[in-house]
């Protein structure tokens, strides 16, 4: 029987859990006082880089979102250090944070579809 997931997929899932816990419990930056959701993690095949896609509860203002992403990217070395302690990997990937706006796009589409059904 073949494995359903390759190693990078399993590591991405584990990174998603650990980074979400670190952001919620260990990151004490007062500039980030909103709920942050780690929606997806993409790991390179050689496990040297990980792209972390996050969404914010209050993500209406694009400028605030960019500031929060910048803050998270500046704290990525601290988060990586905590990951080294919590995960048993020989190489812990470098972390790059990106904003995931798929929830907002999906919400806009559902509102448009809802308005279309009301007009009919």
From Swiss-Prot:
GO terms for cellular component: cytosol. Monomer. Binds 30S ribosomal subunits, but not 50S ribosomal subunits or 70S ribosomes. Keywords: Cytoplasm, Ribosome biogenesis. GO terms for molecular function: ribosomal small subunit binding. This is Ribosome-binding factor A. SUPFAM superfamilies: Ribosome-binding factor A, RbfA. GO terms for biological process: maturation of SSU-rRNA. The gene is rbfA. It comes from Buchnera aphidicola subsp. Acyrthosiphon pisum (strain APS) (Acyrthosiphon pisum symbiotic bacterium). It is found in: Cytoplasm. One of several proteins that assist in the late maturation steps of the functional core of the 30S ribosomal subunit. Associates with free 30S ribosomal subunits (but not with 30S subunits that are part of 70S ribosomes or polysomes). Required for efficient processing of 16S rRNA. May interact with the 5'-terminal helix region of 16S rRNA. Belongs to the RbfA family. PANTHER family: RIBOSOME-BINDING FACTOR A, CHLOROPLASTIC-RELATED. The keyword ATP-binding does not apply. Pfam families: RBFA (PF02033). Its main location: cytoplasm.
């Amino acid at each position: 029987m073949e494995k359903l997931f390759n190693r990078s997929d399993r590591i991405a899932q584990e990174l998603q859990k650990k980074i979400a816990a670190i952001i919620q419990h260990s990151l004490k930056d007062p500039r980030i006082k909103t709920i942050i959701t780690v929606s997806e993690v993409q790991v390179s095949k050689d496990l040297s880089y990980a792209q972390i896609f996050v969404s914010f509860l209050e993500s209406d203002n694009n400028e605030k979102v960019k500031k929060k992403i910048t803050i998270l990217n500046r704290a990525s070395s601290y988060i990586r250090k905590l990951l080294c302690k919590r995960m048993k990997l020989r190489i812990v990937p470098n972390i790059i944070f990106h904003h995931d706006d798929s929830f907002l796009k999906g919400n806009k589409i559902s509102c448009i579809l809802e308005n279309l059904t009301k007009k009919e």
